[in-house]
Amino acid sequence: YRNWLAQDDTLSELLELINRQLTEKGLKIEKASAAVVDATIIQTAGSKQRQAIEVDEEGQVSGQTTPSKDSDARWIKKNGLYKLGYKQHTRTDAEGYIEKLHITPANAHECKHLPPLLEGLPKGTTVYADKGYDSAENRQHLEEHQLLDGIMRKACRNRPLSETQTKRNR
């Protein structure tokens, strides 16, 4: 059903309908001044891991494993465990109401999937996101669309975060 909902904007239309009803009932603020972006792993149905699994850079399994029912799902290693599935990138308003979803294979990196989540945000909205969305391209996109930068900073190799950046991330 996830694939069916993601096709032809059905999921977007459903979220729009739910948010409109919440606004009409006075349960949701029409225009929030902040947007929160995050990603979560959605595991697909499959057999439990019974052997060590080796995965290449594209999330394809090298070696023999039990075949999955879902050929679009990809493997990702999280907290030392391999998971087969998708990554759901979500934009919520400041109150936590979901406004937009974007689904990718689990091995897709967050930083390349921020712009689709920001479509339709009014100018001046602060966008908060974790370090996975930290990139020069995303900061430029925010600037071009006159959105305020609330993305956490990520330390680079041999360049730790400054004290100011560390405090800002909290």
PLM regions and their residue ranges:
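Polybasic low-complexity intrinsically disordered regions
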Residues: Y1-K154
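Short amphipathic alpha-helical "interface-anchor" segments enriched in bulky aromatics
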Residues: I41, K167-R170
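Short gly/pro/ser/thr-enriched loop/turn and capping motifs at secondary-structure boundaries
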Residues: C156-P160
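Active-site-proximal loop->helix
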Residues: E163-Q165
